[in-house]
Regions:
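Active-site-proximal, glycine-rich beta->alpha crossover segments in alpha/beta enzymes
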Residues: 1-7
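Histidine-acidic metal/acid-base catalytic patches
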Residues: 11-19, 23, 33-133
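Helix-loop segments that flank and shape redox-cofactor active sites
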Residues: 30
Length: 133
């Protein structure tokens, strides 16, 4: 149901986004796993691909939040940055470190699972062309 509602919403707003040149972007779930039984919609590569293909429009994009994505040990931010750079409309550079039990903490930009140097290299052209980072 959550995905159907998201597709409906995106389908409804994309004509307006096209008309006014507005890029919409989804922020990955933070954290990228269930908490208290709440559903998640964008937690991994498959979810991002579904989201971008649900309404395949260049105005429908991704907020590349390295922190949210790196909080899930199943995600490799370096690969995600390469794969989804063209549809990334906003970049949020933060990093995390894994803790026992699936927990995580914020980490410095040069350490942690965010791999910010490598991820930034893949997103470089997009970052340079973007008004907001």
């Amino acid at each position: 149901m959550l995905r159907e509602n998201m597709r409906y919403f995106l389908s409804a707003i994309m004509p307006v986004c096209e008309e006014y040149g507005v890029n919409m972007c989804v922020h990955p779930d933070d954290p990228p796993f269930q908490v208290l039984g709440l559903p998640r919609i964008v937690t991994n590569e498959a979810d991002i691909a579904w989201f971008l293909n649900a309404v395949d429009n260049p105005h429908n994009g991704l907020t590349f939040c390295a922190g949210s994505l790196s909080a899930g040990e199943h995600n490799d931010t370096r690969e995600l940055a390469k794969k989804f750079a063209k549809r990334t409309h906003f970049v949020h550079l933060r990093s995390t470190a894994a803790m026992p039990g699936g927990n995580f903490i914020e980490s410095s930009h040069l350490t942690g699972r965010g791999h910010l140097i490598d991820s930034s290299a893949s997103l470089r052209k997009k970052i340079r062309d973007c008004l907001c980072v």
